[in-house]
Design a protein with these regions (language model features):
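Transmembrane-helix boundary motif in ABC transporter permease subunits
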Residues: 16-47, 59, 161
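Generic hydrophobic transmembrane alpha-helix motif, especially the helices
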Residues: 46-98
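Non-cytoplasmic
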Residues: 149-177
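Hydrophobic alpha-helical transmembrane segments of polytopic membrane proteins
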Residues: 21, 91-99, 168-189
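Transmembrane alpha-helices
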Residues: 131-160
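Membrane-cytosol interface at the C-terminal ends of specific transmembrane alpha-helices
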Residues: 82-124
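Transmembrane alpha-helix signature in integral membrane proteins
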Residues: 2-30, 146-152
Length: 189
């Protein structure tokens, strides 16, 4: 049945989107209120992590999970799905890491653009605090930009989900690709 793999993939996708939004917003808040040196360092780290291919990131997380298990005997993240078992935490973490930094960079760019606008200077002149200006004005005005770029983030996550399902032996939405006859694919095209 297609319903179970679809709901499993949808759960992973939803968890990834939720984790991505929460983490990217928290990173931006931390970044915004940090000293200038730390802000530059954080931007460089985000750029570096975003340049790592998703396949390598997935393997690194799997290896890290196995390394922790070998050292401590504690299985924090189940590295693969076997049989009818489903893994949830590892796919969500693996799918979230790169989109978190992509979304962080989108938010940061949008916040930088908003800071240049006149209403921010006016708010400072009125005596509003940096915190009030950020949460009440800047962050609220950046949501339009964030949601207009959401489609790129979603396509990136879906394409990574295809790779992840294969690497982690997940029985998700894209599992139908494994057992299809080439004639069936040709007819579908």
């Amino acid at each position: 049945s297609l319903k179970d793999p679809f709901s499993y993939s949808l759960l992973i996708l939803g968890g990834t989107l939720l984790a991505t939004f929460i983490a990217a917003l928290l990173f931006e808040v931390f970044h915004y209120f940090s000293p200038r040196i730390l802000q530059n360092f954080f931007r460089e780290i985000a750029f570096f992590i975003q340049s790592i291919p998703d396949v390598i990131m997935i393997f690194a997380i799997q290896l890290f999970s196995i390394w922790i298990f070998k050292k401590t005997g504690l299985l924090i993240l189940d590295p693969v799905a076997l049989g009818e078992d489903h893994v949830y935490l590892l796919p969500i973490i693996a799918l979230s890491i790169l989109p978190i930094f992509m979304l962080f960079q989108m938010i940061d760019l949008s916040v930088s653009e908003e800071q240049q606008k006149m209403y921010v200077e006016y708010a400072y002149a009125k005596g509003l605090s940096k915190r009030e200006i950020f949460f009440k004005h800047i962050l609220r005005n950046t949501t339009i930009t964030i949601f207009s770029n959401l489609q790129y983030l979603l396509w990136f996550i879906i394409s990574s989900l295809l790779i992840l399902e294969r690497l982690l032996n997940m029985d998700g939405l894209f599992s139908f690709i494994n057992g299809l006859d080439i004639k069936f694919i040709a007819v579908g095209l």
